[in-house]
Amino acid sequence: MERFLENAMYASRWLLAPVYFGLSLALVALALKFFQEIIHVLPNIFSMAESDLILVLLSLVDMTLVGGLLVMVMFSGYENFVSQLDISKNKEKLNWLGKMDATSLKNKVAASIVAISSIHLLRVFMDAKNVPDNKLMWYVIIHLTFVLSAFVMGYLDRLTRHNH
């Protein structure tokens, strides 16, 4: 009975495989939205105000960071929790594949969230005259919470690695 339960639990990790594949579909959706934004802005590029163009560019950078985050979570999560990726030797392989454990993935995700939040906060500040002060305050508080959380996670990781 014990062997059956252990084998069943170990095999259940494959339930995550479609979830990680779903992230690749989310990446496709993000890419479509990215190019939709570019197609939308190109006809208006010469009539746009510089600040509006910067807001669009920040939005594109934001989507790019989210896309990178999706790739990182998709591949690292799959390798850490499901199975190693069998990529043939003659194909290009991302140099961080197989080297990122769950803790380093968590720290990279936290750093990515801080970067994404920073871009979002910059977009909000560029339109600050149209945003109520209390809403600006909450954006800053939320961003600082992300920054503090990422810092604490990195610090705790450093402490645990140093003690082992």
From Swiss-Prot:
This is UPF0114 protein YqhA. GO terms for cellular component: plasma membrane. It is found in: Cell membrane. Belongs to the UPF0114 family. It is a multi-pass membrane protein. InterPro entries: UPF0114, UPF0114_bac. Its main location: membrane. HAMAP family: UPF0114. Pfam families: UPF0114. Signal peptide: none annotated. The gene is yqhA. The chain crosses the membrane at residues 15-35, 53-73, 136-156. Keywords: Cell membrane, Membrane, Transmembrane, Transmembrane helix.
